[in-house]
Regions:
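Catalytic histidine-centered segment of alpha/beta-hydrolase-like enzymes
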Residues: 483-495
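Catalytic histidine neighborhood in serine/cysteine hydrolases
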Residues: 92, 471-486
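A catalytic-pocket lid/entrance helix-loop region that shapes and gates access to the active site
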Residues: 154-168, 239-302, 347-362, 366-371
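Alpha/beta-hydrolase fold active-site neighborhood
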Residues: 300-444
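Catalytic-loop region of hydrolases
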Residues: 2-14, 24-169, 208, 297, ...
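Short beta-strand/loop motif that positions the catalytic acidic residue
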Residues: 443, 448-451, 455
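Alpha/beta-hydrolase fold nucleophile elbow
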Residues: 220-230
């Protein structure tokens, strides 16, 4: 099922489907006591292959020229209110700058979103996209606390997760509602049992403080930063806490920092419905006949009927699992993150209508961090833990039922699914921090804020809200008229020029710039 504020979202979620190369970095716990953590020296080594629990596979391929990706572990306080207490290990990855050392600016730190996404996994998979930026920066990313090898949150085991992600997430009667809440409580109880020591310390404010420690340990006077999706929220919180330490920063696929978890979920309902509308329009406007229907209305009605039928009669998926209504919905949402994956969605739906749910199940597995061997990463456990630690609101069954009409109006297809996702923090062991993050950053330098008009997961309005919330003279708004979650990865020349010009040469784009 979706987690509360489902999911705030993953910038690389859709692309992750066809990526088999992941990696892990060493992490660990320790005892700081009187150690000055800002003076620690990182022990960079060639990155190892990931553990089975992180998806398996091989170590990342060498960089152009033969250099290897380097991994290290940074010690950080477990509890930032007790900086001399116990420590945790924060896993880092780096690609050293490829250009002349005399032109090196420093480190460029990436967060690719989630919350719960592994930067140590994602950066090497997409490193070639940032080759130009690497000419003047060391490219650096990390597993935020609670993610992957950085004291990764552990909840249920793989077998239990198979059941959890197959459950009915859109209950139709009291018995189904009760079962849904019971399953959520059991999952959350397992998180507390297995990771209770860490749960109070995975808030976004904690991760932001880790980034400032990272800045110091990397030897940079300022934090140069590229945040995508949830990474924009993390970057905004950093700018609020450390405005004078912000260097050149870019936010892409921007979370609306003014919204509550409920408002964010409702915004996603509208965003994914828009993406579905655009998908149906794209399919039916092609020269060839759309295999899903003759008109946009036909396409959407057939999908709705298909999902309704799955509620009572699942079809074969990836043996031994069937494709349930929840898995199919999750798979469709996954494919709507990127226009590049619309052909897979078309094929997946076409085959599912004939009784073969394997493609949609694969898409759902990708969203949930499940590999072909049935091993789950901790991306969803971390997503829930971070969201529930951040978001103060807790939503009862009765409250969600009252809000269903608004969600259904926003998205006839996805409204129920996203509304019931708000139950994800029921009986969570840690109190949420706030209704929404503080990102006001008076005194910070310009931050480039890019919004896609067709972004389903972080709707365009979020970029405008972030630019305003950062403060006058800080948020520099750039609009990309296009589909998908994230603008830089679209390879749009206008967007690339705006971002590269700022990060490499300090040229601030004109606020209000529109790229299409």
């Amino acid at each position: 099922m979706p987690s509360q504020s489902q999911p705030r979202a993953r910038a690389t979620a859709a692309a992750a489907l066809l990526l088999s190369a992941t990696l892990a970095a060493c992490g660990g716990d320790g005892d700081s006591k009187d150690e000055d953590l800002s003076a620690q020296k990182l022990n960079w080594k060639d990155c190892p292959a990931p553990a089975d629990s992180e998806g398996g596979g091989e170590a990342p391929s060498p960089l152009p020229g033969g250099a290897e990706w380097q991994c290290a572990t940074m010690k950080a306080p477990l509890d930032w209110t007790e900086p001399k207490g116990d420590t945790i290990g924060i896993a880092l990855i780096k690609a050293a700058a490829s250009g002349d050392k005399g032109h090196r600016i420093g480190s460029l730190v990436f967060n690719f979103g989630g919350p719960g996404g592994s930067g140590v996994t994602t950066l090497p998979a997409f490193g070639s996209d940032y080759a130009k930026l690497r000419t003047r920066y060391d490219l650096v990313s990390f597993d935020p606390r609670g993610v992957g090898r950085s004291a990764g949150i552990e909840c249920e085991d793989d077998e239990q997760l198979d059941e959890y992600f197959q459950q009915d997430s859109t209950p139709d009667d009291d018995a189904e509602k009760k079962k849904l809440v019971e399953n959520v409580k059991a999952f959350n109880s397992a998180c507390d049992k297995n990771s209770g020591k860490t749960l109070p310390h995975v808030r976004t404010t904690d991760a932001a403080r880790d980034m400032d420690l990272m800045r110091q340990v990397l030897g940079d006077d300022k934090l140069h930063y590229f945040g995508i999706s949830y990474g924009t929220e993390l970057g905004g919180v950093y700018a609020h806490l450390f405005p004078k330490k912000v260097g050149r920063a870019v936010f892409d696929a921007v979370v609306d920092p003014t919204q509550s978890a409920e408002e964010g979920s409702l915004g996603q309902a509208k965003g994914f419905q828009l993406a579905l509308d655009n998908f149906a329009k794209d399919c039916t406007s092609k020269v060839e006949d759309c295999p899903l229907g003759d008109t946009e209305k036909d396409v959407k009605e057939r999908i709705a009927t298909f999902l309704d039928d799955l509620d009572s009669k699942p079809i074969p998926g990836l043996p031994p699992r069937d494709l349930t209504q929840t898995a199919a919905t999750n798979g469709i949402l996954q494919a709507l993150y990127s226009k590049d994956f619309w052909p897979y969605l078309t094929q997946g739906l076409e085959e599912a209508y004939e009784g073969d749910g394997r493609i949609l199940m694969s898409l759902s597995d990708s969203m949930n961090g499940r590999d072909e061997d049935g091993e789950y990463s901790n991306i969803q456990a971390a997503n829930i833990a971070i969201n529930c630690a951040d978001d103060k609101a807790r939503y009862s069954t009765r409250y969600i039922e009252e809000k269903l009409p608004a969600f259904r109006k926003a998205s006839p297809l996805f409204g129920d699914y996203l509304a019931w996702g708000m139950a994800g923090c029921t009986d969570w062991a840690v109190e949420g921090q706030a209704d929404h993050p503080d990102v006001g950053a008076a005194g910070a330098p310009p931050i480039v804020v890019i919004g896609n008009t067709g972004d389903p997961a972080t709707p365009y309005e979020g970029a405008r809200a972030m630019a305003r919330a950062l403060g006058k003279g800080v948020g520099v708004e750039v609009t990309y008229k296009g589909e998908g979650h994230g603008a830089y990865d679209s390879k749009n020349a206008c967007v690339r020029d705006a971002v590269d010009g700022y990060l490499l040469d300090g040229e601030v784009p004109k606020t209000g710039t529109v790229c299409s």
